[in-house]
Amino acid sequence: MTVYLHDVNRGLGVFLLVVSFLLPGCSSSGGRRASVPVMVDATAQVVEQARQTWLQEHPNWGFHGRAAISQGRDGGSVRVEWEQHGRGYRIVLSAPMSRQSWVLSGSSSGPARLEGVGGWVRVGEVAEQVLFEATGWQVPMGLLPDWVRGRNSGGGDVQLDAEGRPHRVYQRGWQLRFLDWFPSSVGRPVLPRQIEASRGSARIRLIVDQWDELIP
């Protein structure tokens, strides 16, 4: 990814941000189209930088939401209850239609543990692999903690919206789109309300119903 940041008018504080990357094409070759320039003014840049700083300073968080996950013709919907304490996480997934539920817990620096209905347990070094072996779902667990909050962790190609927030992200073969945001509230900046991720035949659509700030 190449990012060119030019000072268009210092008096007006307007900047031209050109994020050069390739969008996934519709052809089987997976070609990409170059993005168009996005105008991000200085005020929006300051607000977004403050938001990124706030995210870094608040590592304990959680949310309640819903997710639709599909792999080709197979898929399902689950309720999601996510608690994140620094690098540690506890995620409850429940599928009302099939009456199945799973609890995924662990740390980004340690093994993952998945518990299912009936008391069975799977343990592995990579949370994504543990979840895939049990459910058949491809879910980028290592990327989601940053994605779900719209945090720029680096390592991916990013297209910004006019507010300076991430609009599209390409990382490790995944394409992520931010579709909707919660407005800012007292003591909390804007946070994603709806995101969509895809890689090959894998599709994930997440809707956050409520954000929670957890006490350390």
From Swiss-Prot:
Keyword Protein transport found:
yes
Q: Where is it mostly found?
A: membrane
Top-level lineage group: Bacteria
Pfam families according to UniProt: LolB (PF03550)
Q: What UniProt keywords apply to this chain's record, in alphabetical order?
A: Cell outer membrane, Chaperone, Lipoprotein, Membrane, Palmitate, Protein transport, Signal, Transport
Cited Gene3D superfamilies = Lipoprotein localisation LolA/LolB/LppX
Subcellular compartments: Cell outer membrane
* Mode of membrane association: Lipid-anchor
Q: Which InterPro entries match?
A: LolA/LolB/LppX, OM_lipoprot_LolB
Which cysteines are disulphide-bonded?
none
Q: How does it assemble?
A: Monomer.
Q: What does this protein do?
A: Plays a critical role in the incorporation of lipoproteins in the outer membrane after they are released by the LolA protein.
User: Any idea what this protein is called?
Assistant: Outer-membrane lipoprotein LolB
What organism, scientifically named, is this protein from?
Xylella fastidiosa (strain 9a5c)
